[in-house]
């Protein structure tokens, strides 16, 4: 079989040994803005490297837009991705501030903006009708 295998859930899949994840020389306070898959993966990686990580999201639910991708038939396994990332982050000591706006008072050393995507509404006639 030609080509590379990749994974929607784990970007390092099949490449774990190409770029070793090293501990940081200096521990930093890292602010992640967004609790979707990108934000949680960034939080997990930063925590694995030894940083103090806090994830902020103005929503009270993790990965709100991403979870909607699990609704179509055959895509249900996607609903477990956010839960798995969240658990991994919790084990690593990541702090979550859900339903919170970011403020200047936090004063992190580093900020990662992972505010995600917007839902795609296909251009289907009548899609906003009451019976749809």
What name fits each language-model region?
Residues 26-30, 99, 129:
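Phosphate-coordination loops involved in phosphoryl transfer and adenosine-cofactor binding
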Residues 33, 56, 107-116:
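Short hydrophobic core segments
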Residues 1-13, 51-54, 58-61, 67, ...:
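Iron-sulfur cluster-binding cysteine motifs and their immediate structural context
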Residues 1-8, 34-35, 39, 112:
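Cysteine-centered iron-sulfur cluster-binding motifs in ferredoxin-type domains/subunits
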Residues 9-24, 90, 115-132:
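Glycine-rich dinucleotide-binding loop and its adjacent helix/turn
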Residues 27, 50, 93, 108-109:
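Short, well-ordered alpha-helix to beta-strand connector turns
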Residues 97-107, 118-121:
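A conserved short coil-to-beta-strand element within the FAD-binding core of flavoproteins
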Residues 32-95:
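Beta1-alpha1 glycine-rich phosphate/pyrophosphate-binding loop at the start
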């Amino acid at each position: 079989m030609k080509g590379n295998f990749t994974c929607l859930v784990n970007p390092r899949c099949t490449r774990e040994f190409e770029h070793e994840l090293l501990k940081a020389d200096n521990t930093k306070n890292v602010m992640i803005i967004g609790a979707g898959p990108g934000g949680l993966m960034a939080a997990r990686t930063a925590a694995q490297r030894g940083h103090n990580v806090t994830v902020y999201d103005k929503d009270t639910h993790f990965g709100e837009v991403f979870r909607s991708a699990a609704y179509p038939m055959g895509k249900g396994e996607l609903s477990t991705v956010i839960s798995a990332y969240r658990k991994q982050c919790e084990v690593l000591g990541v702090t979550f501030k859900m339903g919170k706006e970011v403020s200047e008072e936090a004063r992190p050393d580093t900020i990662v903006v992972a505010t995600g995507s917007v839902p795609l509404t296909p251009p289907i006639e009548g899609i906003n009708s009451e019976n749809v």
